[in-house]
Design a protein with these regions (language model features):
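Canonical Rossmann dinucleotide-binding motif of NAD(H)/NADP(H)-dependent dehydrogenases/reductases
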Residues: 2-34
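Substrate-binding pocket helix/loop in short-chain dehydrogenase/reductase
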Residues: 96-97, 101-109, 196, 203, ...
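C-terminal substrate-recognition "lid" of short-chain dehydrogenase/reductases
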Residues: 117, 215-244, 249-250
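Active-site helix of classical SDR
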Residues: 120, 156-157
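Alpha-helical segment proximal to the catalytic Tyr-Lys
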Residues: 125, 169-170, 235
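Residue(s) in the substrate-gating loop at a strand-loop-helix junction
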Residues: 140
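Short, small/polar-rich loop/turn modules that mediate ligand/substrate recognition or access, typified
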Residues: 172, 177, 237-239
Length: 251
């Protein structure tokens, strides 16, 4: 157990997706924060919520071995360490095996698998040493339902989910939990663009009609769920993958 006046959470990246909402939720849950590449104005919002905030720039490229280590180092320098982390990883891509190139394979492997390995290598040692901590790596629900039209993306996400599973088992005897989450159909610009819904509302309906929940996931919904895995209260579930996808991965 640690003796910091407040729990400290590392979040990366906090530009988009559920991550700005997660930062706000963690501040509400009485955490100080170390942020990778924060959205403009986000740090000021968090300070108004009572949090101390450290922003580490130039941490967008998680295929670099030292990217997440920079966040760990800042947490140690500013707060004496950290208690939990959520890292959003990934490089999107579509294509069948026959349509994909060797370069496509390299990009997907580095963005979706190696980035997770680097994150775990940076985050696990200090938490194992202090005998407590929680890690969530956000991958994608695509890893739980690989389809032929996103073969490399789904396969590398699936591999990352299994790496997280192994990390959870490795860290469990040391009081550290490691879990994965994966979203699908989130209401944010990149997803809307990927499905063409940013220019054609009919395409959005085509997506939601295929979901058991018949709606998109709001970033705040996903953030609230993930916050529960890293706020220090629920510390028994580990080595799990939790899809946040409205039931899509079970269809």
């Amino acid at each position: 157990m640690t003796k910091r006046e407040k729990r400290v959470v590392i979040l990366a990246d906090t530009q988009t997706h559920m991550m700005p909402a997660l930062a706000r939720e963690m501040a509400r849950r009485n955490h100080n924060l170390v942020l990778g590449d924060a959205r403009d104005g986000l740090a000021d919002e968090l300070i108004k919520l009572g949090a101390k905030v450290e922003v580490v720039p130039d941490t967008a490229d998680q295929t670099k071995e030292d990217t997440i280590q920079k966040l760990v180092d800042r947490a140690v320098d500013a707060f004496g360490g950290f208690d939990s982390a959520c890292i959003r990883t990934g490089t999107h891509g579509i294509g069948t095996i026959m349509d994909s190139t060797n370069e496509d394979c390299r990009i997907q492997y580095e963005g979706n698998f190696r980035s997770v390995f680097y994150a775990l290598k940076a985050l696990l040692p200090p938490l194992v040493e202090q005998k407590s901590g929680q890690i969530v790596i956000n991958t994608s629900a695509a890893g739980a339902r690989v389809q032929e039209w996103f073969a490399l993306y789904g396969a590398t996400r699936a591999g990352a989910n299994e790496l997280i599973h192994a990390a959870g088992l490795e860290a469990a005897p040391h009081g550290v939990t490691v879990n994965g989450t994966g979203t699908y159909a989130m209401n944010y610009p990149s997803f809307l663009h990927d499905v063409g819904a940013d220019t054609d509302p009919a395409k959005l309906k085509a997506v939601t009609d295929q979901l058991p929940m018949r709606k998109l996931c709001e970033p705040e919904e996903a953030a609230y769920f993930v916050a529960t895995l890293i706020d220090g209260h629920g510390t028994f579930q580990t080595a799990q993958f939790f899809p946040i996808d409205g039931g899509w991965s079970f269809m």
